[in-house]
Amino acid sequence: MNWDVRYAREGYLFGKEPAAFLSREAARIPQGARVLSVADGEGRNSVYLATLGHDVRAFDLSHNAVAKARSLAAEAGVEVAFNLSGIEKWDWTQPVDVIVAIFIQFQGPEARAATFARFREGLAPGGLLLLHGYAPRQVEYGTGGPPHAENMYTLPMLRDAFGGWEVLHEADYDALIEEGSGHSGQSGLIDFVARKPAG
């Protein structure tokens, strides 16, 4: 997948509005929290978080996506610390209060396990993880995401990956989403919100 090519198209591939999941769950985030939006794309989620008053940093590996994200932030009149980076290159030693990871299912099982380990490292004690993506049946729907069931999430997988964390919300459901041309139609979805132990 060449994300720079995908994001070079005119307009916003996933729209300008935040993911419906994030709109529903953002109230859990403490005011003024240090938030990291992972593989943020064109900025729809990070910009929304900044409008809520959070200290937001975000990264994506696509030059075109980051440029569009900066334009979206300027349009909204907010500041986001945008960075050009992939998950593997990001400095996870600088802890944040909240990690937001939405539709990052371009990784297979091995890379995903490494990413989840980075999340466990990069989140401050007592911090929140807001994770949202597709369930394996999404491959049959074909309305977004890669055509690889092994890249998708299940709730047992996520409970295992973040064992010992307090699960605040989890759901496995189908819904009609309209989030730009990239995510459009009936979809098999997973929500997972958990708090890292404070100790």
Regions found by a protein language model. Name each.
Residues M1-P30:
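Conserved class I S-adenosyl-L-methionine
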Residues S62-N64:
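Conserved SAM/SAH-binding beta-strand->alpha-helix loop
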Residues A69-R70:
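Conserved SAM-binding loop
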Residues E75-E88:
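Conserved SAM-binding strand-loop segment of SAM-dependent methyltransferases
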Residues W90-V98:
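A short acidic, Gly/Pro-enriched loop at the edge of an enzyme's catalytic core
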Residues F106-F119:
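A short, conserved alpha-helix within the catalytic core of class I
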Residues G126-Y134:
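Conserved beta-strand signature within the Rossmann-like core of class I S-adenosyl-L-methionine
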Residues E150-A171:
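Short alpha-helix
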